Amino acid sequence: GPPFSNGNLHMGHALNKSIKDIIVRSHAMRGYCTPYIPGWDNHGMPIESAIIKQNKLNRKKMPVTEFRSACHEFAQHYVDVQSEGFQRLGALGDWAHPYLTMNPSFEAEEVKVFGRMYQRGYIYKGLKPVYWCPHDETALAEAEIEYQDDPCTTVYVKFPMYDDLGKLSHLDKSKLNFVIWTTTIWTLPGNLAIALHPQEEYAVVRADGGEMYIMARPLVEKVMKIGGVEHYEIVETHPGAFFENMLASHPFLPKTSRLVLADYVTMDSGTGCVHTAPGFGADDYQTCLRYGMDMVVPVDDQGRHTDYAGKYAGMKTEESNPVILADMKESGALFASEEIVHSYPHCWRCKKPIIFRATPQWFCSVESFKDEACAACEDVRWVPAWGKDRMRSMILERTDW
């Protein structure tokens, strides 16, 4: 695609343009008509982020029209700067007549295409969890995500039994706890459910002192070791489906969490009891939707907790992590914690950690034309040949954009 007009050229630009120039020239020398029309992408966060940083602008205090005008001037300036640089590289092209995505004629064509897509039912507005950058306050596509290794505190949290539906009346309900595991402490205020695998065996484990914990049978030894519990016994076991629709008390908010079933629950990590917050995860969202539960998104555009989070309202997600952790330690809700390093998504523009958050967005549905796109792959000569299978696989796995 075309480069962003958001700064000076770098070595990546030089490499990309040189390769393109070699291809264009070699075909022209073989008698093909291969005019190269240079172009620039003048829209999007790369432009906004660059001008805010370079000109020290506060876009929230500027009228929208003024900010757009500033971005337009900034983009045009770097079109001129980059064009001069590409020409100095000796790249062959119609530099006097480039295409710019900010030209009104170009934008008009985009609106026409968008209109046709809407008329065909490809465009819809929905509330779904998406990658969200609190720093740039924008949704991100999967292609705009970069993963980095970050230190993280993982927690094992007790959710006391609230309603066992009469199935465990022979046990002391006041001592029963479901134990969940999460690497994102800040999502706990958004918890609405605990997901179990319907067929896997879950154990009721009694520790010295009488407190009982419910977790997946294959993970008992590992979890109890992490919790520093040396002496315990398995009282009874049941399949996950046995616990469906029971209720647990939230560890620090005045509400309950529903026990639900999900096939994606695995036995390779955690406790087998999956913390489920529909506003912060795609699987969580779909599971709670299936059970007819309301959507709760207790974090705003800037990554701050809303009033729904109680005493943590106004805190940024990263600020709330140690506070929530300390509160759970003090209240006894924390079963255990560990320090780990894990791969975590970051914004490709600002390089800061992002969150997964449900927000109203316009989506392009790709289901209706996946087959057509795959069929079109057959009409292309692929070099190397394995590119076709790779492209087909990518198309089939593509979610709504």
Stretches with model-predicted labels:
Residues 216, 383-384:
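Generic structural signal for alpha-helix starts
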Residues 180-183, 217-233, 318-332:
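Short, basic/low-complexity N-terminal boundary segments at the transition from targeting/disordered tails
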Residues 1-210, 277-290, 294-309, 321, ...:
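N-terminal, positively charged nucleic-acid-binding surface of large information/translation enzymes
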Residues 174, 267-271, 357-358, 385:
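Short glycine-enriched loop/turn motifs at secondary-structure junctions
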Residues 189, 193, 200-273, 282-286:
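Protease-associated
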Residues 243-245, 311-321:
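A glycine-biased structural micro-motif
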